[in-house]
Amino acid sequence: MVDDEKREVSEEIEEALKKLHLDDVDWARALSPHEILYLLDRCPFLQIVSTNEIEAFSETKFITAQSGWTIHHYGEAMSSSPGPLLFQGGDYRILGDDDEGDDGEGGTIVNPGKGTIVKQAFTTAAEMIALAQKSGWRGVRIIDGHPLMQWAAWMQATDDAFHLEGYEPDEKARKKRERVKRSEVEDQLKINVKPTRR
């Protein structure tokens, strides 16, 4: 019976792959760094701890960030990721059992009005730094995280003159910060265009 079920599942997978024109896939090959980064870009997360001695909460606090993500606040540590929103970012539709299908009808918008997964990741990391400050942390140590969320945490900590360890920005990260912080007027002056009055 078990062998029949395995064979049936294998046949279903094979059929689905043929429909996707993926009938000659080497599942044993190693993933390339590009493919790993592609997957990581869809699964951003951040884990931070306090640099000073903070007592752990008796129960984890689950805080809904402005991005719609859940921040897990342990007292002396925090973490966040898209969680149930992991498989898509921004405004997207998820179909339930009663929904129509591929014709664009039906479905429910998940996490509406929160922007792209990149914006959500950036907003959440910044909010975690703000929450750390409100919680009496004297600084943050990044334990692990997606490069974008580490950079966003550094951006917010730098803006707030808040101590941050575990992330050292390279020249590319510093230049990106400069671009983000540069005002519209500065951009226009760089290309020798005078701003118009609105």
UniProtKB/Swiss-Prot annotation:
Region Disordered: start-end pairs: 166-198
Domain of life according to the entry: Bacteria
Name of this chain's protein: Uncharacterized protein CBU_1754
Organism expressing this protein natively: Coxiella burnetii (strain RSA 493 / Nine Mile phase I)
